[in-house]
């Protein structure tokens, strides 16, 4: 029996402690509820803290959970963030069992909150699954921490002159919608270097590298007063891999293919014509497809200049063959005229012979019956005396020339234009590429962001 007494005392003590804890918990919750009720009693959430007196300072910082995608055609970007705001409301000071009260989003609607909006935002979404994603904490000195999870779709002006070697500074601008700077000012909670956090795993983009971010603040004037605007610039550098594979390499290969025609015989007109027309059509297709991923801007980009020069080289190769063919035909006609001029006088056949044949057949003595045809200038001796008279009476007529076939000089071989083109075209294209890539790769193409503090 004595052995059971310690166990009984232990059980009684544990039950007593649990009862005390339950009483303390109930007292704590009742105390907090009473504190909140007292704070909200007579509280007007239509008035900002310090209304009619001091300026309300709202400290902000941003944590980016996901950055992207970035659209060049629409000139916009999307990101998910935790947007944090901190301010002090003297009306919410309290003394109680805890220094910080962690409350849910229902408390937000009962107190004053800043009317922050995103000036360059096209569409912003506050997440509500499974409940509104909002964090609310109240410190004993009246300081409030208010955090929201947002998806922001914001405008990003882009100057695409250096595309695709370009960089952009995409801004995110926010401030008060109704309160001028005489009533509300915004500041960076952790300073300009650490107030915006972008983890490396949150910025994996397909076409860009997020190389950093900068913050600034500025004051703008409008008809309703001066407002403080906070700005975050996200610096993006474009990746060139896609465009090297899809645009630049095919253009270079097409130009090289067009220059292969310089090594084809100039007599092969169909082959060289097919080369020229095919490469021109290929360049046209490439130039059209390259524009699909770009907005319809009114100026030429760096890629447009490259495609235009490649198109000029391809078209020049086709014009070069036209020139070769023209001068080849011109040379052939000239050689034909020279051959006709240099031809020797033809061997003549006298018409006297033809007349003589007829006379001899008619007037010859029937005794001899001369039927042999005379086909040369030298006549055989005819025993008839009348034949001699016929010869003496036959007039000598001018001869008719017999033109022998012309022997034209060969026009084959390599044209001098082709010989020069085999050297000039590759050298010129290589020089253009050298200058083009040196200029754009060594150029600072990142857009400059304004950093007015």
UniProtKB/Swiss-Prot annotation:
GO molecular function, one term: heterocyclic compound binding
Disulfide bonding pattern of the chain: 156-170
UniProt keyword NAD present: no
Tissue-level expression: Expressed in brain, in cerebellar granule cells.
Regions of this protein lying in the Extracellular compartment: 20-243, 291-304, 444-453
Highest taxon listed in the record's lineage: Eukaryota
Positions bearing Phosphothreonine: 403
Alphabetic keyword roster: Cell membrane, Chloride, Chloride channel, Disulfide bond, Glycoprotein, Ion channel, Ion transport, Ligand-gated ion channel, Membrane, Phosphoprotein, Postsynaptic cell membrane, Receptor, Signal, Synapse, Transmembrane, Transmembrane helix, Transport
Any one GO BP annotation for this protein: chloride transmembrane transport
GO annotation, cellular component aspect: cerebellar Golgi cell to granule cell synapse; chloride channel complex; dendrite; dendrite membrane; GABA-A receptor complex; GABA-ergic synapse; hippocampal mossy fiber to CA3 synapse; neuronal cell body membrane
Membrane topology: Multi-pass membrane protein
Glycoprotein listed as a keyword: yes
Annotated signal sequence range: 1-19
SUPFAM superfamilies: Neurotransmitter-gated ion-channel transmembrane pore, Nicotinic receptor ligand binding domain-like
All ranges on the Cytoplasmic side of the membrane: 265-270, 326-422
Reaction equations catalysed: chloride(in) = chloride(out)
Glycosylation sites per record: 31, 128, 141
Compartment(s) where it occurs, according to its Swiss-Prot or TrEMBL record: Postsynaptic cell membrane; Cell membrane
Subunit structure: Heteropentamer, formed by a combination of alpha (GABRA1-6), beta (GABRB1-3), gamma (GABRG1-3), delta (GABRD), epsilon (GABRE), rho (GABRR1-3), pi (GABRP) and theta (GABRQ) chains, each subunit exhibiting distinct physiological and pharmacological properties. Binds UBQLN1.
Function: Alpha subunit of the heteropentameric ligand-gated chloride channel gated by gamma-aminobutyric acid (GABA), a major inhibitory neurotransmitter in the brain. GABA-gated chloride channels, also named GABA(A) receptors (GABAAR), consist of five subunits arranged around a central pore and contain GABA active binding site(s) located at the alpha and beta subunit interface(s). When activated by GABA, GABAARs selectively allow the flow of chloride anions across the cell membrane down their electrochemical gradient. Alpha-6/GABRA6 subunits are found at both synaptic and extrasynaptic sites.
Family membership noted in the UniProt record: Belongs to the ligand-gated ion channel (TC 1.A.9) family. Gamma-aminobutyric acid receptor (TC 1.A.9.5) subfamily. GABRA6 sub-subfamily.
Note on domains (UniProt): GABAARs subunits share a common topological structure: a peptide sequence made up of a long extracellular N-terminal, four transmembrane domains, intracellular or cytoplasmic domain located between the third and the fourth transmembrane domains.
Protein name: Gamma-aminobutyric acid receptor subunit alpha-6
Organism: Rattus norvegicus
Organism lineage string: Eukaryota, Metazoa, Chordata, Craniata, Vertebrata
